[in-house]
């Protein structure tokens, strides 16, 4: 099971780490991207387009996706598997963003979690999932972002709707269950963090 953790230490030190527990080789590489790159949401008709504001370094998966990374402002984004994820049907009236580019979009455009959450709340584009490279199943993922202040947000699609969980307290995320259930479990198990 993949896990993402944010640690806030003394003197303003913040570190984000994650485990990648996948059953097959994801053919991962490190990619470094400069600012000023023209990007495309890779969804075909009416794909989202943007130019990166920030440089970033990312880990790739299957040579097509940015799964984890950090930009020059200290924003970190991580994609983790979420079997319960359910995305809305494609609405071509909204620009589309492939789920494989979700991390990169965050890193390219936002310096802080507050900025990312405020923009996502405007609901101006649609995240679009696709089949895994082996064709076995739909990619079902949720996204976490953290920043240099230790602020955190979790973005999940369930029942076709996006839910955003935003708090400096949301420092741990695993694959499953959905984040509302992870929070409920956390409140039942306070002795684990004593």
Regions found by a protein language model. Name each.
Residues 93-124:
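Alpha/propeptide regions of enzymes that mature by internal proteolysis
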Residues 46-60, 110-114, 118, 181-194:
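A short, charged
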Residues 29-32, 39-43, 101-104, 168-171, ...:
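Glycine-rich loops and low-complexity Gly/Arg-rich segments
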Residues 62, 98-99, 137:
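Short, glycine/acidic-rich beta->alpha junctions
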